[in-house]
Amino acid sequence: VKLAYFRPGQYIPIKFKIGSALFVRPFTLCASPTLSQTGDEYLIHIKKMPFDTESAYIFDNWEKGTRLSSGAPDGTFYYQPLRDEKNIVGITDDFGAAPFYAMACAVADGLLDIELTLIYGCRKKNDAVFMDEFIALSQKTEKFKPIFVFSDEKIDKCERGFITKALLEKYAPAGKFSVFINGSSGLYTRTAPHISAMRLEKKYVRFGSGDFGKDFVFLNGFPEKERGKIYLCKVIKDKKIMSLPCRSDETLLAALEREGIDANACCNSGECGKCRAKLLKGNVFIPKVYDRRRRADIAHGIIYT
């Protein structure tokens, strides 16, 4: 049985347990789709994060032969010729480089007919995941050009500072182009004003699911009086009624996972909507910048856990 084909930039959701807790995490496919068809394998990118239970568990426990449950390739962060320009400016950091690595591999393989300029911002050279691989791919094809930007140190043939409107305009191609941005929540926050200042049509700016982290309590609109509180949530699933604690600084999904409840999650960012649930009573905080619910869902009280 052949593995499912995927588009460069997509991920696969992997389900695994840690004790009684049940997790589903999206892992980016970081290779050309050719590998899944000729080599019958997927390559995923996992970064070990400090104070992160899931990545620490994976690095300590997963090994060759470990059996995992995975869903099909998913996600919308890929080139769509009916929507996107062939000239693409990618913006990323060390949290979001993997989708662009898959795209660059596909460009080098001749599977993806685009011109990709990647603006890659990091603090230091040692933080730049895939840097050597990106440079090697750029030597194989003229259609891929990586630009590295380091804020904390000066590196030969690299930019120094931060990703700004001036820097983007310096490397952006002439004529129309699309902007693809994927990375940490900090990257979105820092670069959004500069992208907005470029006055691109909305359809030409694409955001990946990225790593929104656990800092949503610091976003505009979060009610100050709710900080540090713990709530008792009542959940109805498969005709069963369950009660579980949920902190104000965590998502409903995190609370469900901790109790081992399968919420049918996939993207872990509120993009795909597979974790839809109906809010029967109470209030939830949904950051406007990350709210990707359909109008019909909003009208009928549907939330993404």
Please state what every model-predicted region is.
Residues 1-67, 122-124, 150-153:
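Ferredoxin-reductase
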Residues 50-234, 245:
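FNR/FR-type flavoprotein reductase catalytic core
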Residues 222-265:
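N-terminal pre-ligand scaffold of iron-sulfur
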Residues 5, 60-63, 245, 266, ...:
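Residue-level "contact hotspot" at macromolecular interaction interfaces
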Residues 2, 57-58, 242, 263, ...:
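Short, conserved secondary-structure segments in the cores of folded domains
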Residues 261-285, 289, 299-305:
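Local cysteine-cluster metal-coordination motifs and their immediate loop/turn environment
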